[in-house]
């Protein structure tokens, strides 16, 4: 999902802006001056992170852009180090997933259940860290990015780089389920608290 697609769901986007601390208006689905002001603050923080940590490949940039600016900083800091490490290992690394709206999450949840296909998630809309602009997943590829490695011992190697970033959790430290490609900003102690806060706006 791109940031443009997220913005089309105006109420969801307003909640994202409010969660980031920029939007002080009502969640009404109407783009007004308060939302415009919040979007400017979002873009300013986004630009600052790019200046500090640099920019990357198109796919990673597309997914980073969907995260809260504070999470974008984490993603950029981690990816800068991860790309250097991946290169030494003879691989390429990219961020392949960022924020999902509740609607997109529900569609993924339906796959392998009410819709054809293999199951890809156990979380409905509002029950995934990806629904709040806080989490991203990365993928490991061949140097030319023509081959994707869904399984590799290097997920652990690269994922561990996130452990040293303050207020960050790497899914490889989880017990059930272990999620080595997953990294998130620790804004809330549980996904329940994240959902409750997000929905309360």
Describe every region a protein language model picked out:
Residues 56-97:
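Active-site acidic/histidine clusters and adjacent loop/turn architecture
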Residues 26-27, 90-99, 168-177:
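Surface-exposed patches in mature extracellular/periplasmic domains of secreted proteins
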Residues 16, 20, 78-89, 157-168:
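Generic non-transmembrane alpha-helical segments
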Residues 108-122:
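Short, surface-exposed loop/helix-turn segments at secondary-structure junctions
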Residues 1-4, 24-27, 63-74, 144-152:
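Second-shell loop/turn segments in exported
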């Amino acid at each position: 999902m791109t940031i443009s697609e997220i913005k089309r769901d105006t109420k969801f986007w307003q909640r994202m802006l409010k969660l980031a601390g920029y939007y002080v208006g009502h969640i009404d689905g109407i783009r007004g001056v308060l939302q415009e002001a919040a979007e400017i603050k979002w873009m300013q923080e986004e630009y600052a992170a790019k200046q500090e940590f640099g920019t990357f490949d198109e796919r990673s940039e597309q997914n980073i852009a969907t995260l809260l600016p504070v999470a974008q900083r984490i993603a950029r800091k981690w990816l800068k180090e991860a790309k250097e490490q991946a290169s030494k290992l003879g691989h390429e690394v990219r961020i392949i997933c960022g924020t999902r709206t509740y609607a997109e999450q529900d569609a993924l949840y339906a796959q392998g259940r009410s819709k054809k296909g293999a199951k890809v998630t156990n979380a409905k809309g509002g029950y995934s860290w990806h629904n709040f602009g806080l989490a991203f997943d990365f993928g490991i590829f061949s140097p030319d990015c023509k081959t994707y490695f869904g399984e590799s011992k290097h997920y652990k190697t690269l994922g561990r780089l996130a452990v040293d970033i303050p207020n960050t959790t790497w899914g490889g430290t989880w017990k059930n389920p272990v999620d080595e490609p997953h990294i998130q900003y620790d804004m809330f102690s549980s996904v329940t608290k994240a959902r409750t806060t997000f929905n309360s706006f």
